[in-house]
Amino acid sequence: IKGIDEATGGRRRWDVGFHFGDWLALDGEGDDGFKGATEDGYIATAYYYQSADIVAKAAKLLGREEDAASYRTLADEIKASLQAEYFTANGRLALTTQTAYAVALYMDFAPEGSKERIADFLKEKLKVNKGYLKTGFVGTCLLNKVLSDYGNNELAYKLLLNEDCPGWLYAVNMGATTIWER
């Protein structure tokens, strides 16, 4: 965490250096299409936030109050940076990918009062995509949890049990035992 802070000059956004993005997402275009359409800096900063949040909680459990307070402050500052950079004043997420919505909800950094709206945007995005996931390694593992958390169990099951490409069961039915690369 300290290395990220040093590399970014304390800006609380991890948008420098190479990032894998939402590796192998199906919504990417161009030469870097394999990284998906979700901005690398958004994903990296989200994980920077989550890491600081986890360390703050762990330090508190271990009785390291000074470390807990320091990392809580850092996590709160990163969260504020995410909100300032990627959310409108009305709480609308500027990035409109399935992954962006899922990450904001799962990692719980969306502004208060906007979470249900973001969950609705995710649900609508999946409908527009005819119930198919467009996520890569980052977003895929979060989708069903987030959908279920926000009362969309039916849609979560539809994603899980989809036997058409690019559904999870398509790969299983084709004999896959690991996640496929393109």
Model-based region annotation:
Residues I1-R182:
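Active-site core of glycosidic bond-cleaving carbohydrate-active enzymes
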